[in-house]
A protein has these predicted regions:
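Active-site and donor-binding regions of nucleotide-sugar-utilizing enzymes
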Residues: 2-98, 227-231, 244-255
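Charged active-site motifs of nucleotide-sugar-dependent glycosyltransferases
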Residues: 3, 145-151, 181-184
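Short hydrophobic segments within beta-strands
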Residues: 6-8, 37, 153, 184-186, ...
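Donor-binding and catalytic core of enzymes assembling or modifying cell-surface/extracellular glycoconjugates
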Residues: 16-19, 163, 168-273
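Active-site anion-handling motifs in enzyme catalytic cores
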Residues: 33-35, 72-82, 88-93, 100, ...
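Active-site regions of enzymes building and remodeling cell-envelope glycoconjugates
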Residues: 47-63, 68-92, 191-222, 277-304
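Mid-sequence helix-capping/hinge segment at a functional interface
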Residues: 84-165
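Nucleotide-sugar donor-binding patch of glycosyltransferase catalytic domains
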Residues: 247-324
Length: 324
């Protein structure tokens, strides 16, 4: 039986953004064997129904394809297609689409088939099969709390997409001003506000895996990104830094929900950076047609927020909450 092994050496969001491309391959080539190799929690690719066979330790992270004994190994990391990454301004659906255009050519040549990408890039916005995960505690929280909810992905980005600060100095005053709104944060910080909640408490994930990724400084034992995604689809707004949990909230359901509001703090990158413009291009929303309200606030200095950055963050958060 023909066989394809997908592999990826990098972060969790890198595994999410390729799901619909992989699902198309699975659908159009149903009589193939599929396997996956990555360093992350096995939950991250569970809903693809592809066996996780280990880690790609012996494979080069910058090599896009391997062929061995008739098996095609496909690297799903966008960074191994550096020309595409740079041409389209970093990670966004344009760069992913053109990456998979090359992957489809390789699959077609290797197996003598005729896969074609769909022209509508919105088709490839990721979806998660939440039936594969325990979301019962989230459902209980949602049933007991019908007030407005803002999910804030306030942890540090893994790849320099935005500032690392946990935003407590922005969130605590905001929560005090709007006591009827729940602000659910993905990273804990000291607070006396009863309406500041944390995903650790709302989700209560207990599924532990003994994993250590080479780029982590601690064991990756718990992964609640799918559950955070589920929670996001039941919130009124999502705030984040274009990394980690925020990426898992950028689902097709949320993008096509006209009542959903996104607020993203991004650095400038790619062509916009080099021409002196401040419009960030490294965002999944770039050039897509979506129904949600998506606001990007550029961050000028991710190491030390400037006075303008601080003012823009405060103003954008207040504007967002007032609009709910």
């Amino acid at each position: 039986m023909p066989k394809i092994v997908f592999f990826n050496h990098y972060h969790r969001g890198d595994l999410l953004t390729h799901k619909e491309f992989i699902r198309q391959v699975q659908t159009e080539l149903p009589n193939y064997t599929y396997e996956y190799m990555h360093f992350n929690h096995p939950k991250l690719t569970r809903d693809l129904n592809i066996p996780l066979i280990g880690e790609p330790t012996n494979l080069d992270p910058k090599t896009p394809f391997y062929q061995e004994d008739g098996v095609l190994y496909i690297n799903t990391w966008i960074g191994c297609f550096w020309d595409i990454f740079c041409q389209h301004g970093g990670i966004n659906m344009n760069s992913l689409w053109h990456q998979w255009e090359k992957i489809f050519v390789q699959i077609n040549d290797h197996f003598e088939v005729d896969l074609n990408l769909k022209e509508q890039k919105e088709f490839y916005l990721p979806s998660i099969d939440f039936n594969k995960f325990d979301v019962s505690k989230i459902d209980s929280y949602l049933k007991e709390n019908t007030n407005k909810k803002v999910l804030i992905c306030n942890g540090p980005p893994k790849s320099g997409q935005s500032f690392a600060d946990n935003m407590q100095d922005f969130i605590n005053p905001l929560a005090e001003e709007y006591p009827d709104v729940h602000f659910i944060c993905t990273t804990k910080f000291p607070t006396e506000q009863k309406n500041v909640l944390f995903t650790d408490n709302v989700i209560g994930d207990t599924e532990v895996a003994d994993k250590r990724a080479p780029w982590e400084d601690k064991e990756v034992n718990i992964c609640d990104l799918q559950e955070i995604s589920y929670l996001s689809e039941n919130c009124n707004a999502v705030v984040g830094k274009n990394s980690g949990p925020f990426v898992f909230c950028e689902t097709k359901t949320n993008y096509m929900n006209p009542n959903m509001k996104f607020l993203s703090y991004n650095v400038s990158w790619g062509e916009a950076f080099h021409t002196g413009e401040k419009k960030p291009t490294e965002t999944m929303s770039n050039s897509l047609e979506y129904k949600c309200e998506y606001t990007i606030v550029p961050i000028s200095d991710i190491n030390t927020l400037t006075a303008d950055d601080i003012a823009n963050i405060n103003q954008s958060l207040d504007t967002l909450v007032r609009s709910l």
